[in-house]
Amino acid sequence: MVKLAIDMMGGDNAPDIVLEAVQKAVEDFKDLEIILFGDEKKYNLNHERIEFRHCSEKIEMEDEPVRAIKRKKDSSMVKMAEAVKSGEADGCVSAGNTGALMSAGLFIVGRIKGVARPALVVTLPTIDGKGFVFLDVGANADAKPEHLLQYAQLGDIYAQKIRGIDNPKISLLNIGTEPAKGNSLTKKSYELLNHDHSLNFVGNIEAKTLMDGDTDVVVTDGYTGNMVLKNLEGTAKSIGKMLKDTIMSSTKNKLAGAILKKDLAEFAKKMDYSEYGGSVLLGLEGTVVKAHGSSNAKAFYSAIRQAKIAGEQNIVQTMKETVGESNE
């Protein structure tokens, strides 16, 4: 049995989509228990494997992260993180303030001893449909080569345990594929990754080939990773809008769109980030999953499923035994 703590109040569409996703999750997974944290006036679920705990405060999207965690002690996000810290819950999921959730992860859940800097990881789609693990996407703006090596170690475990990939191929995001390409950070990181024989490091990868499906894990610093992530999200939205506008521009195009409707739907599903769940803050003493702030019920459900798999696979313990102990 896996028990998860859920922030009912975080996100643009909370609590409705959270309640819908939780209801579906407990129906689909008979070995899942949920502790919901939020406003009792907005709670309307009744299930033997769902426990509700009232919280008098909520962390808003515009709140300053660290200050909010310290001052709003009875907020749904803080109480959720405390449930993970105490061991009452195996992991947690929130669509709330990203900075506040990372602060709650660091200051409440706690960092694994030996992990220098936790990393935020996300699974992104590829043209072949299998996707790839990408980190860091914003936990740390600055990074040293040693941090990128550790990100690769964390990503390697994540790809194996969560995505079920044996001996995942690991790449370093760079401006060229040659070993000597890049700045001092990427050059030194390349050396460290190449000398870690526990990793299946396959070399550099350029941004233009990220979605080709040639690798399983891509490592970069949080500043670069966040910009790449937002660029991909923005590009996908723009292409979708352009395609829709083109289809609706004439009768001929509308007929073509109708003929291709099924194929376009399959393509959209393949490229839908919500199929992969949320982003995960790796390197903590518990599983912390960040669902997208604008998540619908489907995306939040995927994030719950992701946290459940992490609990089943005992990913935190694996990280303690490998990354943590090797860096003490």
Curated annotation (Swiss-Prot):
Catalytic reaction list: a fatty acyl-[ACP] + phosphate = an acyl phosphate + holo-[ACP]
Protein's pathway: Lipid metabolism; phospholipid metabolism
Name of the gene: plsX
Function field: Catalyzes the reversible formation of acyl-phosphate (acyl-PO(4)) from acyl-[acyl-carrier-protein] (acyl-ACP). This enzyme utilizes acyl-ACP as fatty acyl donor, but not acyl-CoA.
Biological process, per Gene Ontology: fatty acid biosynthetic process; phospholipid biosynthetic process
Signal peptide residue numbers: none
Gene Ontology MF annotations: phosphate:acyl-[acyl carrier protein] acyltransferase activity
The protein's name: Phosphate acyltransferase
EC number: 2.3.1.274
Subunit structure, as described in the record: Homodimer. Probably interacts with PlsY.
UniProt KW Lipid biosynthesis keyword: yes
GO CC annotations on file: cytoplasm
Cross-referenced Pfam families: FA_synthesis
Annotated PANTHER family: FATTY ACID/PHOSPHOLIPID SYNTHESIS PROTEIN PLSX (PTHR30100), PHOSPHATE ACYLTRANSFERASE (PTHR30100:SF1)
Cross-referenced InterPro entries: FA_synthesis, Phospholipid_synth_PlsX-like
Upper taxonomic lineage: Bacteria, Bacillati, Bacillota, Bacilli, Bacillales
Assigned protein family: Belongs to the PlsX family.
Entry keyword set: Cytoplasm, Lipid biosynthesis, Lipid metabolism, Phospholipid biosynthesis, Phospholipid metabolism, Transferase
Domain of life: Bacteria
